[in-house]
UniProtKB/Swiss-Prot annotation:
Residues 343-353 have a biased composition (Basic and acidic residues). This is Protein slt1. The modification Phosphoserine is found at S227, S229, S269, S409, S415, S418. The keyword Phosphoprotein applies. Keywords: Phosphoprotein. Residues 159-184, 200-234, 252-433 are annotated as: Disordered. GO terms for cellular component: cytosol. Residues 172-184, 215-228, 385-421 have a biased composition (Polar residues). It comes from Schizosaccharomyces pombe (strain 972 / ATCC 24843) (Fission yeast).
Length: 433
């Protein structure tokens, strides 16, 4: 029966039974659905591609915009840096100009200050010195070189081989009140001496500005021997030492007066005018030392005492005890208050005694001996016309007390103001001649 019935579909496919035909129809439907799905996938792929292209374009636009903004910021930063660099260069150029002007002004002020300091030092040292000699030596205290002993120039000046010769010379030169046991320590080391430049010469003259040092002190040098020799310092060494001295003075003068802070010597400071002058040389301040009213020329102390009108010089053979004048501690002169004697005996001695000349002028340095160097062993006797007032008594001190109290001058009694003293210089003609 199978051969009698043939199943033929629309397309001409021949089937043997119905199940085969139904399966074939289901397969065709599935194929159609697959085709529809494939077409949808193609459409979705196209849409996806379009979306991706749009997205990439938008991202590229965003990147371009950011890059343009970055470039703009970099250009602005570069312009700001150029502007700031120009401003900094202008400011530095202005600062350099101002700094150059200020430096030149400071150099000018320092030069003027150094010039004024040199002029003040020269003026002060001219005022301190007694004589106008070009080789005048100013003797400062003994350990003055300890302030700048570490300077290399000082080591060459104060060498050990020169110390023995300098000590022998200093021992010969030490005379007068400085030869006592109080100043025996001055011969232990070489004193520091400063040679003052002659101010009468023009300023263009070669030589140090403020002072020059001499290694071997010798008071008997002439002006021809005071010239610069090979043993003395050179110009550069003098300038270096001058700067070092100014720096030492500036360091010592930081907290005020240098005399209050520097202990120059271990011994007690003497009260003489020469030692005070030496102290004043350590602090050359023009405001400290007032200008002198009297001229600086040296006067004979005997003439100075006679010009006061309180003493009179007469000739006598009688030994009168000497009393040191309280105004001048270095000159041993006889006091006006002598031991009481009758007036007629004094007149008799004046008539019988031969004329004696007064003592010769005293040298610059006095010795501690009594003033008894007149010819024929005569002594200068100072009389007082008020000796007849017995109620006022005698104010003469013993000679032992005067010698013991040599450093401190005795006080004058209060009742001396009531005495009147007149100058009576009497010269009796020489009868023997």
């Amino acid at each position: 029966m199978a051969t009698l019935f043939h199943l033929i579909d629309v397309h001409g496919n021949e089937y043997q039974n119905v199940q085969d035909h139904s399966l074939q129809m289901a397969l065709e439907e599935l194929n159609q659905q697959i085709e529809v799905i494939q077409r949808q996938e193609e459409q979705l792929a196209l849409r996806k591609k379009a979306i991706e292209d749009a997205r990439q374009e938008v991202l590229q636009q965003i990147q371009h915009r950011k890059f343009r903004q970055y470039l703009h910021e970099r250009e602005q930063e570069a312009r700001l840096q150029e502007y700031y660099l120009e401003q900094l260069q202008e400011r530095r150029a202005f600062e350099n100009v101002v700094r150059t002007i200020i430096r030149k002004r400071f150099e000018d002020e320092e030069r003027e200050r150094a010039h004024r300091r040199e002029k003040a030092a020269r003026k002060l040292l001219r005022r301190i010195l007694v004589s106008d000699s070009p080789n005048m030596q100013l003797v400062v205290p003994n350990n003055f070189q300890q302030m700048f002993i570490h300077h290399p120039v000082v080591d060459t000046i104060y060498s050990p081989e020169e110390s023995s010769e300098s000590q022998a010379e200093v021992a010969d030169q030490q005379t007068g009140p400085y030869s006592t046991s109080e100043y025996a320590g001055a011969q232990q080391s070489q004193p520091f001496r400063i040679f003052i430049q002659n101010d009468n010469a023009p300023e263009q003259q070669s030589g140090p500005d403020v002072a020059e040092l001499n290694t071997l002190p010798n008071r008997s040098k002439t002006s021809s021997q005071a010239s610069v020799s090979d043993e003395e310092l050179s110009r550069t060494e003098l300038a270096e030492l001058n700067d070092y001295l100014l720096a030492a003075q500036r360091r010592s003068n930081k907290r005020g007066n240098a005399r209050k802070h520097i202990d120059l010597t271990a011994r007690e400071s003497p009260s003489t005018s020469f030692a005070q002058m030496s102290k004043g040389a350590l602090n050359p301040d023009p405001e400290v030392i007032e200008p002198e009213d009297e001229p600086t020329t040296f006067r004979n102390p005997l003439e100075a005492l006679l010009s006061t009108g309180q003493y009179s010089v007469v000739s006598s053979d009688e030994d009168v005890e000497s009393v040191r004048d309280p105004d001048d501690g270095t000159l041993p002169i006889h006091s006006t208050q002598t031991v009481e004697e009758p007036i007629d005996t004094k007149a008799g001695e004046k008539l019988t005694d031969s004329s004696k000349q007064p003592s010769p002028p005293v040298a610059e340095h006095f010795s501690n001996e009594t003033f008894s160097a007149s010819p024929k062993g005569a002594e200068t006797d100072v009389k007082s016309e008020g000796s007849n007032n017995h109620e006022q008594g005698s104010f003469n001190e013993p000679k032992s007390n005067v010698d013991s109290n040599d450093s401190a001058s005795p006080k004058r009694p209060s009742s001396q103001a009531s005495l009147r003293h007149n100058v009576t210089v009497e010269e009796v003609p020489d009868e023997d001649a």
